[in-house]
Amino acid sequence: MSEDTPLVVAMDGPSGTGKSSVSRRLATRLGARYLDTGAMYRVATLRVLRAGVELTDPAAIAAAVKELPLTIGTDPSREVIELDGEDVSAEIRGDAVTKAVSAVSAVPEVRDLLVAAQRDIAADARRIVVEGRDIGTVVLPAADAKIYLTASAEARAERRNQQNIREGRGDDYAAVLADVQRRDTLDSTRAVSPLRPAADAVLVDTSELTMDEVIDELSRVVAQQISTGSAQ
């Protein structure tokens, strides 16, 4: 597949499957841009938290993000995530945002705002890997390739706990597992854009695969979907 050929890859799945890491590497291999839509929801959540808005007040949440000065880069080799010109790439990964992001993401006005932005970014990129939770079903249903990454809750919790340890946030596997299960329930049962694979997505279980094995499998899946036109 030539790097001159337009390409949109939709990468969906729950948290902890390695979506961000593998999507960046896949984008690099494909000569494509990369968009982390989850980071956009995290920036919106940070905005809400800084405004002191109650997470039980959808109208106030919508008002807080109506004017969202968000900058997000699409170069897979470097992360650029800014809120009103401030680098918030580390802060949006903190516990406060992680615990609140599902509630903010469930507000229809928030999703409408960010989905429109995501579509604009994808349209401006000739080749792009877009990762999130509703890319193949809602954001880019006509994507050239659709992949749904999955892994057991235990495997995902172990990965996140190891990341927390590496980044100095402590070792608490039980708490991380409980949070993974909580977010799975919230994301799969929300009224707006519930987490589910697109009907034409290829499911890839990363539980027992190394990073290199995942990238190889995803490259194969993308090539196969492009050749057969199955993700349409």
From Swiss-Prot:
It is an enzyme of class 2 (transferase). Pfam families: Cytidylate_kin. ATP binds at residues 13-21. It catalyses: CMP + ATP = CDP + ADP; dCMP + ATP = dCDP + ADP. GO terms for biological process: nucleobase-containing small molecule interconversion; pyrimidine nucleotide metabolic process. Its EC number is 2.7.4.25. Residues 1-21 are annotated as: Disordered. It comes from the Bacteria. One of its GO terms (cellular component) is cytosol. It is found in: Cytoplasm. One of its GO terms (molecular function) is CMP kinase activity. InterPro entries: Cytidylate_kin, Cytidylate_kinase_dom, P-loop_NTPase. Keywords: ATP-binding, Cytoplasm, Kinase, Nucleotide-binding, Transferase. HAMAP family: Cytidyl_kinase_type1. Belongs to the cytidylate kinase family. Type 1 subfamily. This is Cytidylate kinase. The gene is cmk.
